[in-house]
């Protein structure tokens, strides 16, 4: 069986602990924790915040799966530090592994029930349905996710996904946030409604045209999730 490594981008924006608790519970209750080889908690903030969080769980990690990785202290870098740490790990690996990538979706709009529904949907497809993601990768897919769109670039809306490390290792690095002259400079085609460089993080995975599987689909385009509710009853029967 191919090794599995979770890369979990976490930061200290308001509501972080509630979202992190939710995802942690799913990682444990679905059996994913037992299946993975590593859970890389990629800390984008003060390390002691997440050290204290992990200690509060009183979890037995005798196998040493949980790795607290201090990728950066500035949440303004968004997902860049974790994605670049993942790229480094993929390139340095001596054998291939499957990547599960998640983050604390929706903290900038924490408390918005619409965004909470979107996060719940992606948690369901990425964490609860982890076996389906692994099966797709084992069958030849290089990337698996939800809500595949091609505008303004190919991407999985929301940016939760699984991928093969061999494919990720071929991706080009994303430009460092400090290299940006201003927020409207982007490495990929500008997002039509928000030209901020953080959308490069969503465009990155598909920049080398992977063989992909769309595991599930919800509201289209993804921005509708900011305006509409999407309860679990809309999708729990899909797979």
Q: How would you name each of these model-derived features?
A:
Residues 1-239:
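ER/Golgi luminal nucleotide-sugar-dependent glycosyltransferases, focusing on the catalytic module
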């Amino acid at each position: 069986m191919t090794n599995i490594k979770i890369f979990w981008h976490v930061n200290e924006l308001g509501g972080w602990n509630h979202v992190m608790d939710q995802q942690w519970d799913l990682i444990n209750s679905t059996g994913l924790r037992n299946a993975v080889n590593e859970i890389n908690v990629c800390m984008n903030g003060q390390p002691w915040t997440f050290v204290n969080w992990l200690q509060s769980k009183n979890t037995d990690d005798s196998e040493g799966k949980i790795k607290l990785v201090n990728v950066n202290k500035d949440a303004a870098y968004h997902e860049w530090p974790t994605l670049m740490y993942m790229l480094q790990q993929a390139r340095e690996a001596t054998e291939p592994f499957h990547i599960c990538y998640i983050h604390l979706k929706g903290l900038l709009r924490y408390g918005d029930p619409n965004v909470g529904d979107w996060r719940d949907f992606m948690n369901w497809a990425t964490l609860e349905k982890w076996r389906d993601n692994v099966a797709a990768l084992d069958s030849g897919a290089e990337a698996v996710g939800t809500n595949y769109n091609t505008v303004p670039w190919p991407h999985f809306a929301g940016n939760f996904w699984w991928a093969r490390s061999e494919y990720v290792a071929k991706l080009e690095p994303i430009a460092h946030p400090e290299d940006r002259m201003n927020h409207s400079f982007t490495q990929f085609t500008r997002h039509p409604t928000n030209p901020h460089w953080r959308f490069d993080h969503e465009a990155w995975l598909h920049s080398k045209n992977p063989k992909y599987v769309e595991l599930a689909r919800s509201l289209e385009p993804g921005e509708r999730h900011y305006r509409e509710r999407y309860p679990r009853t809309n999708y729990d029967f899909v797979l």
